Amino acid sequence: ELSLNPGMNIQDGMLTTHSERTYYAPEADFLREFLGAPWDMIDSPTPAQNELFGPKRRRVPEMMDLKHPVLLGPVQNQEHHMNGVVSRRDNFNEPILGFLEDAYKEFGELTGRHYGLVSTYKTEDADTVYVTLGCAAENIEEAVDYLRDNEGAKVGSMHVNVIRPFPEAAVINALRGKKNIIVLERTDEGLSGDNPLARDIRCALSKGVEAHRHKGTLPPIKPEERPLIFRGSYGIGSRDFRPEHVLGAYEYTQGKTHRKDGKGADDGETFFVLGVNHPYAVISKATPSLLPEKAIAVRFHSIGGWGMITTGKNLGSIIGEFGDVISKKDPSYDAFGALEDKLFVSANPKYGSEKKGAPTNYYLVVAPKPIRVNCELNHVDVVLCCDPKAFTHTNPLEGLNPGGCLVWESSDSPETAWQRIPQKHRQFVKDNNIRIFILPGFQIARNATSRQDLQLRMQGNSFLGAFFRVSSFLDDNSINEDQFRDVVEKQYQKKFGRFGEAVVSSNMEVMTQGFNLTQEITYGEVEDADTSSMRQSPLAPLGDHEIAPTAGCAESGCSSCEPPEEQPERAPVQTLAKFDSEFRNGLGYHQPAGALSAMGVMASGTGATQSKYVARRETPVYIAENCTQCMECITACPDTALPNTSQDVETILSTAARNYINNPEERVTLLQAIPEIEKQSREQMVESVQAKSDKPFSDIVSELVSGLENISDETKKEFSGIIAQLPLAYSNVTAIFRAVEKKSPGNGGLFSIFVSDLCKGCGECVQVCGDHDALRMTVETEELNAQLTTAQIF
């Protein structure tokens, strides 16, 4: 407002925008007084403004004024344009840093919070100084303490608070005489000589040397006082920035480690990257958490749309309320007479652009000291896993500290739950004394509400209760059960009170049940059965077949169709194999930063092999006898997850006999009987349509096959079994069977709608089907999944 220049307050995406911290908020009235109102009359702070507005002006000049109209932003020709551009420098740009310094000073005098153009941390005796923007500085400050305490390193940190105008004098004074500086930036401009911050710092230091040699307006710096500049890229697109990255950067400057390509500081290479699998990457072998002593670190695993992030925020708020209780129980005061905090919280979510239906995480730390680390937590004490299928796509046990706790969504028995843990992880559980708890969160939520959307969201509240059951938080802070319930209920009143007492009560009940029903399981054997896939094996055909990738069989052979021979060979970048080798090869967060990632190209068909099984709680089941083939469900499905087909009766019967009968001799016998089975089946189908009895096709076939001679009961069972797994409609699909059969007897067919593994269980198809009742949402089970997969494979 003083400079009359546009201003931007830049934040780190997903961290400073989404993180939750314990902090003191300045009073609203104080901020209003400090900032002033737009209509306040102030002294014009510069000669230029005095020339334009007079000795006094509005704090925010009113240029859109009908009483005093002016033309804003006219087109400028060449004889005028440059005048305006260069005159902004001395009239409006150059005074800005002075205004900022005055504002920092005034704010510090009023609040005790002192900032400046740059903020330094332990740089006085430092030989090496990190230079950063944004929340990375707090991570680095914790690492600075670690390096000083454990290695005796003379290292410090500088945070640049103002990037435009660039505070060259402040930077020169802060970095003069250092041996090394490590400039870390959330960008990588490969076509530029340096990334922006490093470029500005290099320019400022060069000007300082020039001032030493030739005089100038900036503070002088001797050539021997100019530090060596190391430059690193990190955190782009919210990429995780971890302690081992900070330590690796320092080790690189000291020649203790090299880049992945083998080059190091002794080779004159001063550029590196952090946090990705790249030839220029550096990383330390040391992986400390850098969390305060006695901290409790929590990691949530869930699915986007299930309310886990809301649960995490509620947990953070509740712990914050406990902090007030603890501080008042044994009060102490700071130099200003304010009650000192004795409990600190830091929390942040992690999710991608797809969020809903995709895996999500939430991280929370509670500690008796301020928490400066804001990365993903790889050292945790409690894992709250709201996702019952977590082991099918991740490892929720990863990073659990010895003696840590995993609370896992499961309505299974303890013995079955142990078998849900992959065998490869069970020894880790035993070796590290990991405590495994199960909690039927969805069942608790279903008992609390009949609304499915609320069941998903309220499930998380049960895990909130489970946290207080399994963690040491209540005992560590001497909080009894009455205090616990009182604080939680007050938070629920604050969060849900506007929806009515019933909502508060139901959420409180879910939380309480989560606390009470959390059950610890005893270890089984490492060699016990492994049912961690959460799937049953489908009924597979004999021999080798090309299987639709959307079938969800999760077995070898599920590949996309081969291109025709006459089609030219694809370049690697166009193939699914190349894409899968980097992005779906079990590498998780450690995919290579290579040529393919640089292009930003995906081969066609990647979605066909993507499973939504992880997120599905309910699946539509096709009721063939009710289907009218209106196709509303097909067009409504947002995921093209309802493939459909019409087939001849003979094709269905022959395919079943040819591919699902194990006895070769009886297979031949059955194939010979197919024409007669088809004939009799068709007769009964016509009778059923005329009688409107809607007799299932599978029942018709089963009765006919049971009467065959020279075929064993086992073969009859195999044949009837596969037919029973198929969604085959004829009764009400007029265009496929009834009309065709009437016009051309013997030619009516069967219609099928399959549910593929692309289905996320949104229920849109059931909604549009309506009263036809040909699709019904059904709880997803391993048995149902196997049946749907069997049908698709067929």
Predicted feature descriptions by range:
Residues S3-E185, G190-K285, F300-I303, M308, ...:
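Flexible, low-complexity linker and terminal segments
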Residues A25-A28, Y362-V366, I793:
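Short, hinge-like loop/turn segments at secondary-structure boundaries
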Residues D43, P47-D102, S472-N477, V487-R498, ...:
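N-terminal leader/propeptide and maturation segments of large enzyme subunits in energy/redox metabolism
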Residues S157-N161, F166, A170, I182-F241, ...:
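Glycine-rich, acidic loop regions that bind phosphate or pyrophosphate groups
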Residues P165-A169, N180, L184-R186, L290-T575, ...:
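Active-site cofactor/cluster-binding pocket
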Residues L175, E398-N401, C769:
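A generic alpha-to-beta junction signature in SAM-dependent methyltransferases
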Residues G500-I753, L758-C759, V766-F794:
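Ferredoxin-type iron-sulfur electron-transfer modules and their immediate structural context
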